[in-house]
Amino acid sequence: MAKEIKFSEETRRALEAGVNKLADTVKVTLGPKGRNVILDKKFGSPLITNDGVTIAKEIELEDRFENMGAQLVKEVATKTNDVAGDGTTTATVLAQAIIREGLKNVTAGANPILLRKGIQKAVTVAVEELKNQSRIVETQEAISQVASISAGDEEVGKLIAEAMEIVGKDGVITVEESQTMNTELDAVEGMQFDRGFVSAYMVTDVDKMEAVLNDPYILITDKKISNIQELLPVLEQIVQQGKKLLIIAEDVEGEALSTLVVNKLRGTFDVVAVKAPGFGDRRKEMLQDIAILTGAQVISEELGYDLKEADLSMLGRASSVKVTKESTTIVDGSGDKKAIEDRVTQIKHQVEQTTSDFDREKLMERLAKLAGGVAVVKVGAATEVELKERKLRIEDALNATRAAVEEGIVAGGGTAFVSVIPAIGTLIESLEGEVKLGAQIVKKALEEPLRQIAINAGLEGAVIVQNVVNSEAETGFDALNEKYVNMIEAGIVDPTKVSRSALQNAASIASTFLTTEAAVADLPEKEDAGMPGTGMDGMY
């Protein structure tokens, strides 16, 4: 296929136009007075959201060169979401600012390679300064503040803080849609491990690509299953009972897998197979954990059990099991409470005895899965449109809270970025030439999140930024109440991990963007000319 090529200034302007179209759409959502964006969906009602990455993923531009620019910024939002789970709008705003300031310098004749070096140096200093300013999150109140700011809702903040209190820092919290109008917390015992279904044909919900089994039997074995004959005796008993089955095995392959899939598709029985978590001796211990939690017996030849002789009494039970491509969550296993408590005590004893940090970490993970349980935030709303919007906000808040527990918090509302500017100023004094210009680009861009928050609140951004720059440390602008406050004391905080990831990803993409000198895109296909007219319109 023929290609269209653009060079230098023409390339950069086309790419920048795409960057601006995407960023301008996303940045209207920033801050407590940010607006929402409505997204058209081919099926179902439109989605209204303020989630940066959700908006960015929907944007495809007609012009191929502009679209390339938009896709680059989309990568900033996506990467930030993958790493931190929140801060995608902030990352987009920072990327746009660095690109805008950088292009001014490139157009004026600056070398983009040296600019990039300066940008990288400045970001390294800024990230280090953010870490220095970071405060550890210890109280339930601090967790509540982080979640409240991210979701823009105090009630949600309290709910997530309560969930974390119940399951602990290492517990599992999931977000589900409620059948009622109320948003509530439901905490249940459960376990999650990082193994998903062995075949995508086993899913029960194609849209979410997940399999949900209610009240299933659970078969646990440490062997590889490739012959369906080994499973037939227990499968026949399952079919007679009309129940669903979760198989946890070293692997399920060959004839066994194909037979299970075919019968699942035919509706003969509902079965999902997953690989056993962990490796070696740790796998054996984790299988035993799952067995104790569900009241099952691990079917292992080492223990003298043969799969062909397995019956329903050796299988575990749970109220529900949710399996995705990457994880399996077992909720409300029907194991003996005393046996579970004994197992928890045993693992705690092992934690005290071990001298290996790695072993201790893995034991603590097992302890959290066995003792922590699963908290479910059930999101309710009057309409489906509001429900989806609210669910996205709560998922963001949950991600922000986890990030805060992991790396601490800094002043929110764009204040943390402004507060690292003096450190970059010190760096700039030690630099020369175009590397110095690169650092100055970052210095200017760091003001942008605060400026945009002020603009979205209907205020003059430049004035607000100047006032915060001249204020004491941690003093920022509370856009909701339109006053200057100590952000930490006021509970307006951001997770350090979110702020750090947003800046690093924005700078990474933006600095690479500036080094672009040519762009290549497919030429649009020409439409075939129609049949020539006969000159006798309307006659056949």
Curated annotation (Swiss-Prot):
Its main location: cytoplasm. It is found in: Cytoplasm. It catalyses: ATP + H2O + a folded polypeptide = ADP + phosphate + an unfolded polypeptide. Keywords: ATP-binding, Chaperone, Cytoplasm, Isomerase, Nucleotide-binding. ATP binds at residues 29-32, 86-90, 413, 478-480, 494. The keyword Chaperone applies. Its EC number is 5.6.1.7. It is an enzyme of class 5 (isomerase). InterPro entries: Chaperonin_Cpn60_CS, Cpn60/GroEL, Cpn60/GroEL/TCP-1, GroEL-like_apical_dom_sf, GROEL-like_equatorial_sf, TCP-1-like_intermed_sf. The keyword Ribosomal protein does not apply. Belongs to the chaperonin (HSP60) family. Forms a cylinder of 14 subunits composed of two heptameric rings stacked back-to-back. Interacts with the co-chaperonin GroES. PANTHER family: 60 KDA HEAT SHOCK PROTEIN, MITOCHONDRIAL. This is Chaperonin GroEL. It comes from Clostridioides difficile (Peptoclostridium difficile). The gene is groEL.
